[in-house]
């Protein structure tokens, strides 16, 4: 069985590695939010219910829109959806850091912060969820049936690995400042999106 899109072995390997880094960055960012966001948000005055709603909205958007973006990538291209998803993730992550900074500086109140966080995480869930589904479709396009499951398993392991090392990376970044992880991981993901664009 041949692949549906012809690429050289070198191009495939490089493309898969960059995609793996992208999925790892997103997975690490998710563990960042789980590890860092709740205690920090509570320290600013947000309740457990409010923090839970922020997480739930993002997860709902991811669940509902991932299939849509996967199908959309059939028409406008895998690469475009992957880049869009990574850029949205990078932008919303950095934006969350800025929103917290505005709250700390007294430019916005707690209610405004909560509303902004809902919009930001909702944007990530509904618009940024395409990166994962389009990445899996990208792999399917460039692998044979025999090798497809193995390579997809490797791609899927990016989230598992990020779940292991993510909290440690987040803790190390927090030592430089409570908002450093947002700017750091957002910038890294944006750079990966750039690599995919030029690739």
Model-derived regions, located:
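Helix-loop boundary and gating motifs at the non-cytosolic
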Residues: 9-59
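Cytoplasmic helix-loop-helix junction between adjacent transmembrane helices
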Residues: 120-159
